[in-house]
Amino acid sequence: MSTRDWQVPVLTYHASTVGGPDYAGNDHVAFASDLETATRLGWRIVPLQWVVEQRLGLADRDLTRCLALSCDDGTVLDVHDVDYPGQGRQPSFLTLLEANHGQPDRHLTCFVIASPEARARMDRDCLHGLDWMGEHWWAPALAGGRIGIGNHSWDHNHPVMAEPGPGNMPRGDFHVVDDDVRADYEIRQAADYLAARLGQDACPLFAYPYGHAPDFLVRDWFPRHGARLGLQAAFGTQGGAAGPGSDPWHLPRYVCGLHWSSPAQFEALLASLA
């Protein structure tokens, strides 16, 4: 375990949040602004994996005034510029990240949904039916060096899946993943799918859908099964910076739009952690 006194805020965005041209309704605008603000204020962007390695005692880096980046759900908007219906051209998170040359260690972890059926339904019902939730971009993005791919469950237990899950599991809530059968369905199945496509141990991080972290998973299932699945840590959305005392199976993240929604609020958030 590191003897350094460290805390690292993990910031989370959703590339599908494109509700207009302004910061509060467009995570691409927010992402670009936040990168500029963080760099101007002397914060260093580091890979999310570094945060996990520090917490697990696998590394002892100087993480003073560092932050890490993540995004959830895994749309092509994470890595490719698109023409968004009604909103015009949107630069991807990767495009914006690569343009920030003042951050040599810049990196973004994209937490993706594994199930092809779930992604197809979400693309049709929640986006614009433009095949923005395919998996064709995963391997090239991972190989490029600026993107990590993380596990965001099999199907997010999303309500687009009209049929109940295992054991008549209701949809739209991840707190109900509360036994071995449901956990295997949502997490183990996703880990196996990602490993088959990206390589064993290529996706060691998990993010809880909706930020819901059931005690069963945090205190029981992940400690028993995580390592065998190649998983090292899991992230919530409860706010707060990751540090030496953080639970590795429920590491905190801040979410754009939930914990801050303007440049001034973002700057205040960083100031509170400096």
Residue ranges and their predicted role:
Residues 82, 133, 139-144, 148, ...:
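Alpha-helical scaffold elements lining the catalytic groove of polysaccharide deacetylases
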Residues 50-52, 175-177, 197-205, 210-262:
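His/Asp/Glu-enriched short active-site or ligand-binding loop at hydrolase and phosphoryl-transfer sites
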Residues 7-8, 15-146, 157, 196, ...:
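Active-site beta->alpha N-cap acidic-glycine motif
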Residues 109-111, 150, 232-235:
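Structural detector of well-ordered beta-strand residues that form the stable sheet scaffold
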Residues 22-24, 82, 120-126, 161-164, ...:
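Short aromatic-enriched loop/helix-cap "lid" or pocket-rim segments at secondary-structure transitions
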Residues 1-6, 10:
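N-terminal carbohydrate-binding accessory modules
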Residues 74, 80-91, 165-177, 218-228:
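Charged, glycine/proline-rich intrinsically disordered loops and linkers
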Residues 261-274:
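Low-complexity, Gly/Ser/Thr/Pro-rich intrinsically disordered linker/tail segments
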